[in-house]
Amino acid sequence: MSKIKLAAVCLSLACTLTIQAHASTITVTNTNDNGPGSLRQALADVNDGDTIDATQVSGTITLTSGQLLVDKSVTINGAGAEVLAIDGNATSRVFQTVTGAKTVSISGLTISNGQLSQGGGILNAEATILTIIDSTLNGNKAGLGGGVFNSGTLIIINSTFSSNMASQGGGIYNSGSGMSTISNSTFSGNAAPVAGGVSFNVGTMQIADSTLSDNSADSGGGVYNIGTLTIINSTVSGNMASGNTAGAGGGATFNVATMNVVSSTISGNIANREGAGIYNSDGGTLTITNSTFSDNAALLTGGGVYNSGTLQLANSTFSDNSAAFLAGGILNFANFEIGSTILKRGDSGENIYSNSQGIVTSLGYNLSSDDGGKILTGPGDQTDTDPLLGPLQDNGGPTFTHELLFGSPAIDAGDPGFTPPPFFDQRGPGFNRVINSRIDIGSFEMQTGGTPTPTATTTPASSATPTPTGTATATPTATSIATATVTPSTTATATATATPTATPGATATATMSPTVTPTPTASPRPTPRPRALPTPRARRTPAPRP
């Protein structure tokens, strides 16, 4: 090794040891907003790499001197979300990081009642890595991102977002430069008068092992996506798209760009117009694999999925979805590919209605309780056949599923040429995807050995479908600027008013008002798993809008 290289290595090691030697812990001793022993003073005193210890403090820190600025790489440890809260006093944001290569971790805190045009609870600046662990964001308000506005890297682990509100992105606004990863977390009761009750995503977002329930927005009651979105091993249930204008919809999600749904359950969502489960708009590419869509209800068309982009559907189960006029299961106006999927008709609307000038392909081995829109003509397709499904319930794994009852014609009737991956059915490890040498149709694999005797029940062809009084057309108002790709591995009663024209570094814009005064009603959901077989269809019988 040359003397120059040796000197460089020694200098680097010396710097590392110096940083480690100087890293220290600063202890918070009271709940004052400022002064000795306060969290604000600790943030002013820290150096990069330090830890702030607030584990011995309980109660509420009410901010009276503005937001807390985090301008160092620091770890902030609270006493627990149920023990220590930081309240923005409805006058300021709670935390803001600064632009730069900083790494910030926040754990064991409740962040509440923050308010500003962007990121009522937290604003995470570009190039900063922010990790939120074991924390709660509740009752924060903004124009963009009621809970968090993210332009950097956001990692959320085992946390709860509830009753946050914004014009766009009630829980999170993830900007074009933002990368968000959410795991083992719950989002409930968040609201967005415009779009994205849980999140408005312009960048890249992955949601894994999480629950999104009872959130609401005009479009995209759960997530409004114009970037790249992946949902894995998660439940999206009981969300609502309340918009009544043409192009509004997406009770669970509204997709304009790239979206993947893997091993997840989309259930009990409602749309006042189209796409109670997912509205896949013009230009959107939606891929659904090993997933369940159950009991979603659209008051016009497309109870499970409304598609005017590109839809790819494989090894999934659609059951008891409904629409008042057309397509309780899937409404297709564009490109549609389906394989190894179960379609069980709900109370209203056929399983598939396809009126498309695009490419419609059956890859075969599908099973429909009605005629399947007369498009299921591939090898092994079964139509007018009862799939014999159990109720939506806990059959093991992280999400609810419909089990195949003994004698189901879906058992051992999937593609005989299928070889893993995936290695497991929707429920994950412990539930092999292939039993008895051949895959089952749908998202659920019967685990018992032997070959059940098929007892398929033929049902009469569906009755004539009413002619809709209007033509459903998607009119997305934003276009995706994200290029990254991801590989899969309300009840809020407050109403935000708006003013600032906050425009993050993404194409989406929002009008909000800094005079947001209502306080949303917190609605914690201690049981995040979806309720078995909810019946949202009975909630409304509106007159259709053209």
Name what the model sees in each region.
Residues 25, 31, 75, 110, ...:
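Ser/Thr-centric signal marking residues that sit
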Residues 176, 247, 283, 449-450, ...:
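Residue-identity detector for glycine
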Residues 144, 299-300, 533:
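Leucine-biased recognition of intrinsically disordered, low-complexity hydrophobic segments
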Residues 19-118, 124-126, 130, 329, ...:
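N-terminal, post-signal-peptide segments of secreted/periplasmic proteins
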Residues 451-545:
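Ser/Thr-rich, Proline-interspersed low-complexity disordered segments
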Residues 28, 42, 76, 95, ...:
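Extracellular/surface recognition and adhesion modules
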Residues 1-24:
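Sec-dependent, cleavable N-terminal signal peptides
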Residues 129-137, 150-168, 173-195, 199-218, ...:
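Predominantly extracellular beta-rich ligand-binding scaffolds that present long acidic/polar faces
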